[in-house]
């Protein structure tokens, strides 16, 4: 695990005026300079190395960060120019990794945000082949069963799917092989994310209460919302009612109830409020305090 101290932003940034366009631009430039400094800060580098170790493919000869490298960075006796550092940081950029304590140090220094509002995505981490290919390759998404879909994906890998469907022969289609590589990368990333979310609390896990079973993003965000608020702050979010009833989220819900953090829970049926969601689907508005 990796413990991060909250870095301080220059105090004068918050004091800079922003009453005119020129003052706003000046403050933006100052903030941009601070972000560049943060990117070179050892804490940011170490955080990227920690997360990047989960994201990188574990293949022979790959530059994978190790515990000794992370400890070396944290204690100042490892070089930031190590190939594994560059690989980890590149993986973090590609995945859109966001380190909250390092991006909002002034809020974290005060124990968190006064208010956190969320409307998280309601989707599972596990890559769903039908959903993935629905817009990218409808023929695969429309396959009548899993066996047929798996066969078409294999043909996609070989660049022969279109030939197979049309009953023709010819050279492999580059676009098919490119799409397969993209699918393979997305599949591996989903697996890496799942591994990261399932790290137990004793090993520095980020989501000890909701990183359970077939993880859904809404549950992770619900736990994150609670982590980001300060002890006297509030958090509010809209999530499926499963947050209070599902077995995979029972530890989280039990925690907020026993900790007297649950200020309110209003449960609704969709009733066509959200056309893309079935009208019988239930969701809840939850407030933590």
Q: What positions do the PLM features span?
A:
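Signature of N6-adenine DNA methyltransferases within the class I
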Residues: 1, 93-289
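Nucleic-acid modification enzymes, centered on SAM-dependent nucleic-acid methyltransferases
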Residues: 1-100, 243
